[in-house]
A protein has these predicted regions:
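Alpha-helical transmembrane segments and membrane-interface helix-loop junctions
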Residues: 1-183
Length: 183
């Protein structure tokens, strides 16, 4: 059981650190949107690259924030029955859901995106706009990174659920839980 706890803590720590860093990018995105509005409407200067950078950050925040959201149980669920379940029953639902749905979907996204991302890298795909950002291939790489990070956190959730189902008191197993505010 000790190796499982070590793996679980490593994944949880990685997800927590990356999630908190990514959360700060929303502030950068707000600043860039204000900059786009000010330069466009007050200075009458438009910047395609600046507008695209907002889109890039938006993609980065949403795609790379999925694992952090999963860790903090922030994904939408229909919990008509779930909320009344015991912790062990909830863990069983999470374990089965993780194994039957989360893992296969992450693998499907990764493998169906693989050729698409490689093709973009092969040509160093750039923006269709003349003054756009020349890094579309990097943006598309998020399509591979997202399922990897989500799968890693899914594995952590499966481990936690498995421990609960097997009767282990996870609060006494030195699992890292960080509930501090991001800001």
């Amino acid at each position: 059981m000790k190796p499982l706890i070590i793996v679980l803590n490593a994944i949880e720590k990685f997800t927590e650190i990356t999630g908190r860093l990514i959360a700060w990018l929303t502030m950068v995105m707000v600043v860039l949107v204000v900059l786009v509005v000010v330069t466009r409407y007050f200075l009458e200067v438009g910047s395609i690259a600046l507008q695209e950078s907002v889109t890039y950050l938006h993609c980065l925040v949403f795609l790379m924030g999925l694992a952090f959201t999963l860790k903090h149980d922030g994904h939408v669920r229909v919990d008509i029955f779930y909320r009344g379940f015991s912790p062990r029953s909830k863990a069983m639902v999470n374990l089965i859901g993780g194994l039957l749905f989360l893992v296969p979907v992450c693998l499907l996204i990764f493998f169906t995106s693989w050729d698409y991302v490689l093709a973009s890298w092969a040509i160093h795909e750039t923006s269709a706009e003349n003054n756009g950002l020349p890094f579309v291939y990097l943006l598309k790489t998020l399509m591979l990174l997202m399922p990897v990070t989500l799968l890693l956190q899914g594995i952590a959730e499966i481990i936690k659920s498995g421990l609960v189902v097997s009767g282990v008191n996870i609060s006494a197993t030195q699992i890292v839980e960080n509930k501090e505010p991001i800001i």
